[in-house]
């Protein structure tokens, strides 16, 4: 088995076991009753949706450039709206 085949099977097993890696490219806003959730834009790094940009809600501390592991890439967070 060549090095390229080994790395591709390793990558696919990581995706199957854990999820899809995505890099935080923009922090949008805080949401939740007490502001405990941060809405961010992420770029999917591997998998069938490689390069796709999603809006997701993240609980816990997050910074630009962080790598998140997404269990799936189909769902996207709703846009925040102000209620008056």
Swiss-Prot record:
GO biological process, alphabetically ordered: maturation of SSU-rRNA; ribosomal small subunit assembly; translation
Name of protein: Small ribosomal subunit protein eS28
Gene3D superfamilies cross-referenced by the UniProt entry: Nucleic acid-binding proteins
Keywords: Ribonucleoprotein, Ribosomal protein
GO molecular function, one term: structural constituent of ribosome
NCBIfam families xref list: PRK04007.1
Keyword Transit peptide: no
């Amino acid at each position: 088995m060549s090095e390229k085949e080994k790395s591709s099977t390793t990558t696919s097993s990581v995706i199957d076991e854990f999820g899809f890696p995505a890099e935080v490219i923009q922090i949008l806003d805080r949401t939740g009753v007490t502001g405990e959730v941060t809405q961010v834009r992420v770029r999917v790094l591997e998998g069938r949706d490689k390069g796709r940009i999603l809006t997701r809600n993240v609980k816990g501390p997050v910074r630009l450039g962080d790598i998140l592991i997404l269990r799936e890439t189909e769902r996207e967070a709703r846009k925040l709206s102000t209620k008056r």
